[in-house]
């Protein structure tokens, strides 16, 4: 005989035939009875009624659990439980009974029980209660429409617990504030679709384990600090911490990009040296120095932001976060001296101050740090000398002989040379490269090698 426990041990899969009780294939008489419609009232034959309900109700829920879904519709269940071309005629009655017992809940009713104002209604994530269902209720007809979306209450709670554990075991849990988009990506394998993900968040919100806020067009989620704690409302400190986290990511990406640009400028200067193009090499070195100064300026801001976040991550209570954040914002102002905002006496003023500093960061990232970049010609010459020395260990010509390599090495210029000496050494360097680059006195113009 089939039981929910036995069905739970069956192998998983998308084919319901592998998940159904033994009598599904073995007992034609019983299956014919189970596929027949319920009597209009249980009082007519309570034994038959209870037998059918005891078969279908647990099967509907266990099937949904195995499929990993929390939302179900009558039409989907009818398709899933087809047998030899027939559909169960009593499934609508089963769903009505589960609704009456509170094991199922209409999706629209569930949403009405929780503050769902943050959900993007405009993009069609959820639909309002169908008009057909509303009219049916008014007329006293309690049949479940085939397209009506129902929520399995216990399965939703299980899914919410799964998502909460997933968050707790991820790097996102370093601080309770997280972007909704990041959380959605984390839960992609657990929640099969966007509707399920939003329902899970609403359930966690109902349990007071999360709260959701829209900030500058982007939704952020705040988690409770412990599995048994209640989440506190999103406040200005939470918003400020979230902005700091976004600034850290932005600055880190920009520093990485500028580091790659610096290496590219250095390589261009090295190639120009090998090609005998001193002015081009100097221009590349100047670009490299500009980039390095930008990196240095951004690193200072990044270090400050990371220091604030480190103190916040180490905080265990909202008051400690508050204190760490207040202290951190003051330090951030000192590190960004161009910010001209009067000293704040309240947290709101400090939040505004942080926004001003972030504007400065954005301007820095957009336009670069160019003020005060006076290049020392002697320093550039020194770096050019170093690049010339580097070329001795990385000759480009594949046609060099051992003797040419020796000549190349012996022609390395000494540090701190004058422009005239540098020109002479560059001339020697060009000749040592197998004559690929002629001297300025050569009567014939040759093509430069392709690098």
UniProtKB/Swiss-Prot annotation:
<dbReference type="GO" id="GO:0039702">
    <property type="term" value="P:viral budding via host ESCRT complex"/>
</dbReference>
<dbReference type="GO" id="GO:0031468">
    <property type="term" value="P:nuclear membrane reassembly"/>
</dbReference>
<dbReference type="GO" id="GO:0005886">
    <property type="term" value="C:plasma membrane"/>
</dbReference>
<dbReference type="InterPro" id="IPR005024">
    <property type="entry name" value="Snf7_fam"/>
</dbReference>
<feature type="coiled-coil region">
    <location>
        <begin position="248"/>
        <end position="312"/>
    </location>
</feature>
<dbReference type="GO" id="GO:0000776">
    <property type="term" value="C:kinetochore"/>
</dbReference>
<dbReference type="Pfam" id="PF25239">
    <property type="entry name" value="WHD_CHMP7"/>
</dbReference>
<dbReference type="GO" id="GO:0032585">
    <property type="term" value="C:multivesicular body membrane"/>
</dbReference>
<dbReference type="GO" id="GO:0005635">
    <property type="term" value="C:nuclear envelope"/>
</dbReference>
<keyword id="KW-0963">Cytoplasm</keyword>
<feature type="region of interest" description="Disordered">
    <location>
        <begin position="431"/>
        <end position="451"/>
    </location>
</feature>
<feature type="modified residue" description="Phosphoserine">
    <location>
        <position position="432"/>
    </location>
</feature>
<dbReference type="GO" id="GO:1904930">
    <property type="term" value="C:amphisome membrane"/>
</dbReference>
<dbReference type="GO" id="GO:0005765">
    <property type="term" value="C:lysosomal membrane"/>
</dbReference>
<keyword id="KW-0653">Protein transport</keyword>
<dbReference type="GO" id="GO:0045324">
    <property type="term" value="P:late endosome to vacuole transport"/>
</dbReference>
<dbReference type="GO" id="GO:0043162">
    <property type="term" value="P:ubiquitin-dependent protein catabolic process via the multivesicular body sorting pathway"/>
</dbReference>
<dbReference type="GO" id="GO:0005828">
    <property type="term" value="C:kinetochore microtubule"/>
</dbReference>
<dbReference type="GO" id="GO:1901673">
    <property type="term" value="P:regulation of mitotic spindle assembly"/>
</dbReference>
<feature type="modified residue" description="Phosphoserine">
    <location>
        <position position="442"/>
    </location>
</feature>
<comment type="function">
    <text>ESCRT-III-like protein required to recruit the ESCRT-III complex to the nuclear envelope (NE) during late anaphase. Together with SPAST, the ESCRT-III complex promotes NE sealing and mitotic spindle disassembly during late anaphase. Recruited to the reforming NE during anaphase by LEMD2. Plays a role in the endosomal sorting pathway.</text>
</comment>
<dbReference type="GO" id="GO:0005654">
    <property type="term" value="C:nucleoplasm"/>
</dbReference>
<comment type="similarity">
    <text>Belongs to the SNF7 family.</text>
</comment>
<feature type="modified residue" description="Phosphoserine">
    <location>
        <position position="411"/>
    </location>
</feature>
<dbReference type="GO" id="GO:0007080">
    <property type="term" value="P:mitotic metaphase chromosome alignment"/>
</dbReference>
<dbReference type="GO" id="GO:0006914">
    <property type="term" value="P:autophagy"/>
</dbReference>
<keyword id="KW-0539">Nucleus</keyword>
<dbReference type="GO" id="GO:0090148">
    <property type="term" value="P:membrane fission"/>
</dbReference>
<dbReference type="GO" id="GO:0097352">
    <property type="term" value="P:autophagosome maturation"/>
</dbReference>
<dbReference type="GO" id="GO:1902774">
    <property type="term" value="P:late endosome to lysosome transport"/>
</dbReference>
<dbReference type="GO" id="GO:0071985">
    <property type="term" value="P:multivesicular body sorting pathway"/>
</dbReference>
<feature type="modified residue" description="Phosphoserine">
    <location>
        <position position="232"/>
    </location>
</feature>
<dbReference type="GO" id="GO:0061952">
    <property type="term" value="P:midbody abscission"/>
</dbReference>
<keyword id="KW-0813">Transport</keyword>
<dbReference type="GO" id="GO:0000421">
    <property type="term" value="C:autophagosome membrane"/>
</dbReference>
<protein>
    <recommendedName>
        <fullName>Charged multivesicular body protein 7</fullName>
    </recommendedName>
</protein>
<dbReference type="GO" id="GO:0051469">
    <property type="term" value="P:vesicle fusion with vacuole"/>
</dbReference>
<feature type="region of interest" description="Disordered">
    <location>
        <begin position="1"/>
        <end position="22"/>
    </location>
</feature>
<dbReference type="GO" id="GO:0015031">
    <property type="term" value="P:protein transport"/>
</dbReference>
<dbReference type="GO" id="GO:0005829">
    <property type="term" value="C:cytosol"/>
</dbReference>
<dbReference type="GO" id="GO:0001778">
    <property type="term" value="P:plasma membrane repair"/>
</dbReference>
<dbReference type="GO" id="GO:0000785">
    <property type="term" value="C:chromatin"/>
</dbReference>
């Amino acid at each position: 005989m089939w039981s929910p426990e036995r069905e739970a041990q069956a192998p998983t899969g998308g084919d319901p035939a592998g998940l159904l009780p033994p009598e599904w294939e073995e007992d034609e008489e019983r299956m014919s009875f189970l596929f027949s419609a319920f009597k209009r009232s249980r009082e007519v034959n309570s034994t038959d009624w209870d037998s059918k309900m005891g078969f279908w109700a647990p099967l509907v829920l266990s099937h949904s659990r195995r499929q990993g879904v929390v939302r179900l519709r009558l039409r989907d269940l009818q398709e899933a439980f087809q047998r030899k071309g027939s559909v169960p005629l009593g499934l609508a009655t089963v769903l009505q009974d589960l609704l009456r017992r509170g094991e199922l809940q209409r999706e629209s009713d569930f949403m009405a029980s929780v503050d769902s104002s943050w959900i993007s209604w405009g993009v069609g994530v959820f639909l309002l209660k169908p008009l057909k269902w509303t009219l049916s209720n008014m007329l006293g007809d309690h049949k479940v429409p085939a397209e009506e979306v129902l929520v399995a209450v216990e399965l939703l709670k299980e899914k919410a617990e799964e998502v909460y554990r997933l968050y707790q075991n991820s790097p996102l849990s370093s601080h309770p504030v997280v972007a909704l988009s990041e959380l959605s990506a984390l839960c992609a394998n657990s929640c099969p679709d966007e509707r399920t993900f939003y329902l899970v968040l609403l359930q966690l919100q109902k349990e007071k384990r999360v709260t959701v806020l829209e900030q500058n067009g982007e939704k952020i989620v705040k988690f409770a600090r412990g599995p048994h704690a209640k989440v506190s409302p999103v406040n200005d400190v939470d918003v400020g911490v979230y902005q700091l986290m976004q600034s850290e990511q932005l600055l880190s990406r920009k520093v990485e990009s500028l580091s790659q640009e610096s290496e590219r400028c250095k390589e261009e200067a090295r190639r120009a040296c090998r090609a005998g193009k001193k002015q081009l090499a100097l221009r590349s070195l100047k670009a490299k120095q500009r980039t390095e100064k930008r990196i240095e300026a951004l690193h200072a801001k990044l270090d400050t932001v990371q220091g604030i976040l480190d103190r916040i991550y180490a905080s265990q209570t909202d008051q400690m976060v508050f204190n760490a954040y207040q202290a951190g914002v003051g330090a951030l102002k000192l590190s960004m001296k161009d910010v001209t905002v009067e000293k704040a006496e309240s947290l709101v003023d400090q939040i505004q101050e942080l926004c001003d500093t972030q504007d400065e960061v954005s301007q820095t990232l957009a336009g670069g740090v160019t003020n005060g970049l006076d290049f020392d010609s002697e320093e550039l010459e020194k770096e050019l000398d170093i690049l010339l020395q580097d070329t001795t260990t990385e000759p480009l010509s594949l046609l060099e002989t051992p003797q040419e390599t020796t000549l190349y090495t012996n022609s390395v210029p000494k540090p701190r040379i004058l422009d005239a000496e540098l020109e002479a050494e560059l001339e020697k360097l060009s000749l040592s490269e197998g004559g690929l680059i002629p001297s300025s006195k050569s009567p014939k113009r040759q093509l430069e090698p392709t690098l």
